[in-house]
Amino acid sequence: MSFLTLKDVDLKNKKVLVRVDFNVPVKDGKVTSKVRIEAAIPTIQYILDQGGAVILMSHLGRPTEGEYDSQFSLEPVAEVLSQIIKKPVRFAKDWLNGVDAKAGEIVMCDNVRFNKGEKKSDDELSKKIASLGDVFVMDAFATAHRAQASTYGVAKYVPVACAGLLLANEIKALEKALKAPKKPMAAIVGGSKVSTKLSVLHNLLDKVEILIVGGGIANTFIKAEGFNIGNSLYEEDLVGEAKDILAKAKELGVNIPVPVDVRVAKELSENAVAVVKNVADVADDEMILDIGPKSERNIAELLKSANTILWNGPVGVFEFDNFAEGTKALSLAIAESDAFSVAGGGDTIAAIEKFDIKDKVSYISTAGGAFLEFLEGKKLPAVEILKEKATI
């Protein structure tokens, strides 16, 4: 990797500013998911072990920038972190004018979005943040696609900037899957809209041997193949684009197994009864809500041949058990595979948890937007600035 990581930097007696991703769900002042907090522990612990002081920064939710709002305060997060790491975590509500932190201490700064100029990476704000520490550690991959004061601007002005353990692992796993994959490679791109994943589909066409589409995206492809999809969710204006992708895939020898059978219902509800039909038999008043058993077997068979698997998005409305079979079959096929597998995106992580295959996926990305932008082949500003700093 062409940037410094935490392990390349002397941290003894240094004030270490760490941008973490503690954008966690908080309900009635209580943190309801600790996954992102737990993911940051190795970086925090490493700095403490090396004799540094830890000053943590994160955003939480979408408050009006520049205004304090108690419902978006990171104070409950500081309490949970303290319980997990079994050490005191000092909470700093007002921190821009200086943070007093000694070696071995942990300070949690309040929401970076309470600072005016955070989102546009205001220079004065970035300099102020940079003045708080000797070393800046970027460990929030989920916000790496945003050039903001606490992710990008601070790195420009601090003496030393490096990647945290989580960020470094995240990029290493994604580069292993995308830049030097062990072939054959399969990618699963699911979700409701082609429009949000269009660049991803195009970028992956040049890299994979198998491209599996699911969810509303698959409906658009089924329509592109000339079948009636009834009342199903799809994007009419992108049917032509789907045809182009299918034609390009054929040219490149990429296999896109468009579903041959589906599970349909008359309405989208938890109690709707799933009826299995061939794609040619979908009625006008029916909605495609999952793939069918033949399509499940096709996908499972294809994934057996893969040495690298990239997964982003479900293949059906898996939140409802009657339409979860396709995503369950996909999950189990990935779990049983010996391939190097990388999965990312909120719905994908929810599916991994639902079908209990967390330990069977090689790497699970905690990021949403940044994960997608990486798949699109875009550069991530907060990572690029670390590369620039490493060459200075």
From Swiss-Prot:
Keywords: ATP-binding, Cytoplasm, Glycolysis, Kinase, Nucleotide-binding, Transferase. Its main location: cytoplasm. It catalyses: (2R)-3-phosphoglycerate + ATP = (2R)-3-phospho-glyceroyl phosphate + ADP. PROSITE patterns: PGLYCERATE_KINASE. Signal peptide: none annotated. One of its GO terms (biological process) is glycolytic process. It is found in: Cytoplasm. ATP binds at K197, E319, G345, G346, D347, T348. It holds the Pfam family PGK. Gene3D superfamilies: Phosphoglycerate kinase, N-terminal domain. It comes from the Bacteria. Monomer. Belongs to the phosphoglycerate kinase family. This is Phosphoglycerate kinase.
